[in-house]
Amino acid sequence: MTTLLALFQRPDGGSDALAEFERRYAGEHLPLVAGTPGLRSTEVRRVSEALGAETDLVLITAMRFDDRAALDAGLASDAMRAAGRNLREIAPGLAMLLVLEDADDLLP
């Protein structure tokens, strides 16, 4: 399984700005992402605490695909391109995207 992980920093503007970001993320962005070909599941989590560290991360989304080829096809799709444009509008400079590959060989 290949995962596209999106980490979101707290927007400037306090709790009102965060509430507006979350409203638009849920109402605009996630419906666009849902139309991505090959997307198996999406999980969204709020960051409640960073143990032993400071963080400005407020939201993390995991989008799972069968493999890297499925992710690449999804990224090239019209749905994901539209989601990317929307993300640049609602969260400019606030997102970091990571591609994660299973590492089961590291587990005992």
Predicted regions, residues:
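Macromolecular interaction modules
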Residues: 1-108
